[in-house]
């Protein structure tokens, strides 16, 4: 099996053609396209950009809210000189499931909307000709998928997504599509692990190929080769190594080659950063030095393009994070586009990488009622659907770690977001996931999950599996919001005293906290939704953080305003952003800039 999640790279042995652009598009509400032959000829003149969400490009509500099957179609040319190579199609993501056809022949199926997949089409394509590429996608939600939800049918027969999660169900081909020509024998994967020494660093590596020819691995600093080794496993010894660090990223070029005599059979290039990350004595240590995490929970979300990869927006986001003094973000609530991790590698940002395990709670109202403990709930992990959910969860976790394990920016894995984890089935569900993450990751990064408001120190059955505890807390907003801010602080401190008793030396971070603020809304005295109230809430919350030595990070919710399912609790989306959806600062941004640019990197380091 030649499955590989390596990022597409053009080298002396590999060729790439990008297929992004305007494709043809059609909804298929009756799911008749396959039988009607749409894989060979899509009966539509509608165009659609790739990558992008289709939702916000339309002006009618039925199209924006469409739920069900939908099709994309384009054509691609295969050069004659590619004959003799393996021809592979690679999709960065299709939300939430896809069937891929080439010249009418089905070549791939994939479940999961946030990770890449590929299809080998060597024996299907016609060389020196144009070939038809069709994608049948589907965006329905269920309790066996990540993220979780349901799909309802309206009175007129239309389907509508009913998510258990608080972000919009953007759908489409969201990330780049590549046509690749690869050598028959090639590099499929590699992994690295780092050790710092008195004279530099050592990099233990493992390379996976689909053949038996010898492998060499070289490390370059610019044009200078600084280390080399041979074999599919080995160690690169780097003297006077330049370490990758926060806002001081240093990247080396890794070159992996397969040889047959004097010929190079395959060559794969990547950029890596030498760094270590661990938890010791209740502190996060980057290259052996304490680092206090500060930054955001985020979303891949922007005007018009929805969740589609947009590099100008990515660039703006990183510039804003640098301006405000952040050093970390969580990929809430799903793995992001690979290009975002590459920029984090280059800019020196830390990432808590999150699998799309969100919506793992059920309420007769919505996510908010579940978060407050209102509405009728049941144990989410004691259902008939649980075995299928766990299988899909393991598959997504495996692909995320396989894809992202070599990024120096990735420092931890988040295995779930706000699951209902006080019921009897929690431990049976959690245990194999945490064991799998530890087994798959050669660097043994710390593992966590974000803890729901109703999961307290004495009721959460999942927290014992986490290497560090991650809390989502909204004292002063969802709990005791408004005039009772002093009471909210007292309740907050009471809960924190409880966590102090169960951490057993582990650090604790906040992966969510915040209030909604309508940009430009001012009120004296303050009221909820105003800029003044948002700042008062943040000052109170930060005072609590600073009081507890075991708090080792703060990731505010959210980086920017983002779209959600419409409802009476959301004014055209979630407004907890420190920046507007258009990436302009709210008043609170200046509060964070003052705090984060003055906090030392090793804030709360262990006092000797």
Where are these regions (language model features)?
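Secreted/periplasmic carbohydrate-active enzymes, especially glycoside hydrolases
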Residues: 1-343, 347-351, 396, 411-412, ...
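Substrate-binding/catalytic cleft of secreted carbohydrate-active enzymes
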Residues: 204-206, 318-320, 328-595, 604-605
């Amino acid at each position: 099996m030649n499955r590989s999640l390596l990022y597409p790279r053009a080298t002396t042995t590999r060729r790439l053609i990008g297929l992004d652009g305007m494709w043809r598009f059609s909804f298929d509400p009756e799911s008749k396209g396959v039988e009607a032959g749409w894989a060979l000829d899509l009966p539509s003149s509608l165009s659609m950009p790739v990558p992008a969400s289709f939702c916000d490009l339309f002006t009618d509500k039925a199209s924006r809210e469409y739920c069900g099957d939908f099709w994309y179609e384009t054509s691609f040319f295969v050069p004659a000189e590619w004959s003799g190579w393996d021809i592979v199609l690679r999709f960065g993501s299709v939300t939430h499931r896809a069937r891929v056809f080439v010249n009418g022949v089905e070549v791939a199926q994939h479940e999961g909307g946030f990770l890449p997949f590929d299809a080998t089409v060597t024996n299907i394509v016609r060389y020196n000709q144009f070939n038809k590429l069709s994608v049948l996608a589907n965006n329905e939600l269920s309790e066996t998928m990540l993220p979780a939800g349901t799909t309802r049918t309206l009175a007129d027969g239309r389907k509508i997504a009913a998510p258990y999660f608080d972000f919009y169900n953007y759908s489409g081909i969201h990330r780049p599509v590549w046509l690749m020509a690869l050598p028959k024998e090639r590099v499929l994967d590699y992994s690295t692990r780092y050790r710092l020494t008195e004279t530099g660093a050592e990099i233990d590596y493992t390379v996976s190929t689909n053949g038996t020819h010898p492998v060499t691995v070289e490390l370059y600093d610019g044009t200078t080769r600084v280390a080399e080794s041979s074999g599919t496993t080995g160690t690169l010894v780097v003297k006077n190594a330049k370490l990758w660090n926060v806002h001081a990223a240093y990247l080396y070029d890794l070159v992996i080659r397969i040889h047959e005599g004097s010929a190079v059979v395959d060559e794969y290039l990547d950029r890596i950063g030498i760094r270590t990350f661990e938890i010791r004595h209740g502190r996060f240590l980057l290259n052996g030095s304490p680092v206090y995490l500060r930054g955001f929970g985020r979303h891949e979300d922007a005007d018009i393009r929805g969740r589609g990869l947009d590099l100008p927006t990515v660039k703006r986001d990183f510039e804003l994070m640098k301006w405000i003094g952040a050093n970390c973000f969580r990929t809430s609530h799903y793995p992001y586009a690979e290009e975002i991790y590459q920029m984090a590698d280059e800019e020196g940002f830390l990432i808590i990488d999150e699998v799309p395990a969100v919506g793992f709670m059920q309420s007769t109202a919505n996510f908010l009622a579940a978060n407050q403990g209102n509405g009728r709930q049941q144990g989410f992990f004691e259902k008939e659907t649980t075995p299928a959910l766990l299988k899909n969860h393991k598959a997504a976790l495996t692909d995320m770690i396989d894809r992202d394990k070599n990024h120096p920016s990735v420092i931890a894995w988040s295995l779930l977001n706000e699951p209902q984890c006080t019921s009897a089935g929690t431990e049976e569900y959690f245990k194999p996931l945490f064991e799998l993450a530890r087994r798959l990751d050669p660097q043994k990064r710390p593992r966590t999950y974000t803890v729901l408001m109703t999961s307290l120190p004495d009721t959460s059955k999942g927290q014992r599996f986490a290497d560090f505890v991650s809390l989502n807390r909204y004292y002063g907003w969802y709990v005791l919001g408004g005039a009772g801010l002093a009471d909210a602080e007292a309740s907050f401190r009471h809960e924190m005293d409880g966590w102090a008793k169960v951490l057993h030396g582990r650090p604790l971070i906040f992966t969510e906290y915040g209030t909604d603020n309508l940009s430009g809304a001012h009120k004296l005295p303050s009221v909820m939704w105003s800029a003044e109230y948002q700042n008062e809430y943040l000052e109170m919350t930060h005072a609590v953080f600073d009081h507890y030595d075991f708090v080792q990070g703060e990731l505010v919710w959210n980086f920017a305003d983002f779209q959600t399912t419409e409802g009476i609790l959301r004014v055209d989306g979630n407004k907890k952003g420190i920046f507007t959806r258009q990436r302009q600062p709210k008043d609170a941004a200046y509060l964070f800039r003052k705090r984060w640019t003055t906090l030392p990197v090793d804030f709360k380091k262990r006092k000797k």
